[in-house]
């Protein structure tokens, strides 16, 4: 299987997000990389599903709460930026304060 660097990055994000999803389902609090991967993968999937940039940005603030992550993690993530593939092309999505 031949993958571009971007495709490899997407697979890495997905794998980390899957691990984070499983840990969250078991009741564990997510650490920094898990929280970032969880949110990033959800944003990429929402874009792929056809949501608008504004909808994806808002959606990114609803995925995790302070109760879902370890202490200090929300302050470590002031924003998340991801290049997501929308039906009309690739766009940069920025979510400010993704964990309110």
UniProtKB/Swiss-Prot annotation:
Its main location: cytoplasm. It is found in: Cytoplasm. It catalyses: urea + 2 H2O + H(+) = hydrogencarbonate + 2 NH4(+). It comes from the Bacteria. Pathway: Nitrogen metabolism; urea degradation; CO(2) and NH(3) from urea (urease route): step 1/1. Pfam families: Urease_gamma. GO terms for biological process: urea catabolic process. It is an enzyme of class 3 (hydrolase). Its EC number is 3.5.1.5. GO terms for molecular function: nickel cation binding; urease activity. GO terms for cellular component: cytoplasm. Keywords: Cytoplasm, Hydrolase. Heterotrimer of UreA (gamma), UreB (beta) and UreC (alpha) subunits. Three heterotrimers associate to form the active enzyme. Belongs to the urease gamma subunit family. This is Urease subunit gamma. It comes from Burkholderia cenocepacia (strain HI2424). The gene is ureA.
């Amino acid at each position: 299987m031949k993958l571009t660097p971007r495709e490899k990055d997407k697979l890495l994000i997905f794998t980390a997000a899957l691990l984070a999803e499983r840990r969250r389902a078991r009741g564990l609090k997510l650490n920094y990389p898990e929280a970032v991967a969880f949110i990033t993968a959800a944003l990429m999937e929402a874009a792929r599903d056809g949501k608008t940039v504004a909808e994806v940005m808002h959606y990114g603030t609803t995925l995790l709460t302070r109760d879902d992550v370890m202490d200090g993690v929300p302050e470590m993530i002031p924003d998340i930026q991801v290049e997501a593939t929308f039906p009309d092309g690739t766009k940069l999505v920025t979510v400010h304060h993704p964990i309110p």
